[in-house]
């Protein structure tokens, strides 16, 4: 079984990645040296744990956004996706095709004069095909 990472390791790792994301890599030894330069960590063991978790998080960040880490690159990407406006609406309301029954319902509600509504003949549902040569299914 794996070891449990403490809250200290997780929090400090996330903070270091947010501040020094451009310097961090997917290599443990490089991340350990960077941590030695940028942070004051009381013990070698704790520094190694933070470097290891930072490396783990960097690998996860490569695959996609990670919960709890806010990076400028990811923020910009998210904003770009949210601000996207399609050229043509997915919901077209130029012409709405309804059957006679729906048209009568709209008329009873006083909405028969709404533009773009046209009556269409309802489609007949296909009869179900008998399975297994037309015999009844087995009873267990």
Swiss-Prot record:
Endpoints of the signal sequence? none
Q: Does the keyword Nucleus apply?
A: no
Q: Which keywords accompany this UniProt record?
A: Ribonucleoprotein, Ribosomal protein
User: What's in the GO CC field?
Assistant: cytosolic small ribosomal subunit; mitochondrion
Asked if RNA-binding is a keyword of the record, the answer is: no
- Give an example GO molecular function: structural constituent of ribosome
* InterPro entries in the record: Ribosomal_eS17 (IPR001210), Ribosomal_eS17_CS (IPR018273), Ribosomal_eS17_sf (IPR036401)
Q: Quote the Pfam families the UniProt record gives.
A: Ribosomal_S17e
PANTHER family associated with the record: 40S RIBOSOMAL PROTEIN S17, SMALL RIBOSOMAL SUBUNIT PROTEIN ES17X-RELATED
**UniProt similarity note:** Belongs to the eukaryotic ribosomal protein eS17 family.
What is this protein identified as?
A: Small ribosomal subunit protein eS17y
State the species of origin: Arabidopsis thaliana (Mouse-ear cress)
Gene this chain is encoded by = RPS17B
């Amino acid at each position: 079984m794996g070891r449990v990472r403490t809250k200290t390791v997780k929090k400090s790792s996330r903070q270091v990645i947010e501040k020094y994301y451009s310097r961090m890599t997917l290599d443990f030894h490089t991340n350990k040296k960077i941590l030695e330069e940028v942070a004051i960590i009381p013990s070698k063991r704790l520094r190694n744990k933070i470097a290891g978790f930072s490396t783990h998080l960097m690998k996860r960040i490569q695959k996609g956004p990670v919960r709890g880490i806010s990076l400028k690159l990811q923020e910009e990407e998210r904003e770009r996706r949210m601000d996207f406006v399609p050229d043509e609406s997915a919901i077209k309301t130029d012409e709405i095709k309804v059957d006679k029954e729906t048209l009568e319902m709209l008329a009873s509600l006083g909405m028969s004069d709404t533009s773009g509504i046209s009556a269409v003949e309802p489609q007949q549902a296909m009869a179900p095909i008998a399975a297994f040569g037309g015999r009844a299914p087995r009873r267990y």
